[in-house]
UniProtKB/Swiss-Prot annotation:
Pfam families: Fe-S_biosyn, NifU. The keyword Chloroplast does not apply. Involved in iron-sulfur cluster biogenesis. Binds a 4Fe-4S cluster, can transfer this cluster to apoproteins, and thereby intervenes in the maturation of Fe/S proteins. Could also act as a scaffold/chaperone for damaged Fe/S proteins. Disulfide bonds: none annotated. [4Fe-4S] cluster binds at residues 149, 152. Binds 1 [4Fe-4S] cluster per subunit. The cluster is presumably bound at the interface of two monomers. The keyword Iron applies. One of its GO terms (biological process) is protein maturation. It comes from the Bacteria. It comes from Sodalis glossinidius (strain morsitans). This is Fe/S biogenesis protein NfuA. Homodimer. Keywords: 4Fe-4S, Iron, Iron-sulfur, Metal-binding.
Length: 191
């Protein structure tokens, strides 16, 4: 469910050594399955453990996950990274905003999942996002760009060289991708 690297476990173990005995960590998602989902880590003293929590035992620590957050933390990873600028804890949870779908799910759900979990996090760095509007009978994925992508001079490149290539590679049944957006250049546009 969640991978916690050795470096992160050591970091947590050090922090937990200053807490009440038996205290571990809790990993959670606020607003799971929505575009506003946020992940977090907190201390979890023994009296805060619920009967419905899942305990994940690692070499140096245990992590508790509540039953509502659990499906959205599939494939999550917590790491503690040190570089020239210092150290930071990173938590990557690709399924926090949308529950992972099975390979047998309808094509529209699988495409939507890929857009939300893989493509939109990349576009978010530029203040943009893309939404799947429909998949046509002739197997075209119709997309609409928003935020910083609307009116961006790089949107055609992003669509053809990024999104379309990835979607066609993952879903060979698709024949192409089209942009439905009426692009209007403005201050919101990234380029």
């Amino acid at each position: 469910m969640i991978r916690i690297t050795d470096a992160a476990q050591e970091h947590f173990a050090k922090l937990l050594s200053n807490q009440e005995p038996g205290t571990q960590i809790r990993v959670f998602v606020i607003n799971p399955g929505t575009p506003n989902a946020e992940c977090g880590v907190s201390y979890c003293p023994p009296d805060a453990v619920e009967a419905t929590d899942t305990e994940l035992k690692f070499d140096k620590i245990s992590a508790y996950v509540d039953e509502l957050s659990a499906p959205y933390l599939q494939d999550a990873e917590i790491d503690f990274v040190t570089d020239k600028l210092g150290s930071q804890l990173t938590l990557k949870a690709p399924n926090a905003k949308m529950r992972k779908v099975s390979d047998e799910a309808p094509l529209i759900e699988r495409v939507e999942y890929l857009l939300q979990s893989q493509i939109n996090p990349q576009l978010a760095g530029h203040g943009g996002q893309v939404t799947l509007m429909e998949i046509t009978d002739d197997m075209l994925a119709i997309l609409q760009f928003g935020g910083g992508c609307n009116g961006c001079s790089m949107v055609d490149y992003t669509l053809k060289e990024g999104i379309e290539k990835e979607l066609l590679e993952k879903f060979p049944e698709l024949k192409g991708v089209r942009d439905l957006t009426e692009h209007q250049r403005g201050e919101h546009s990234y380029y």
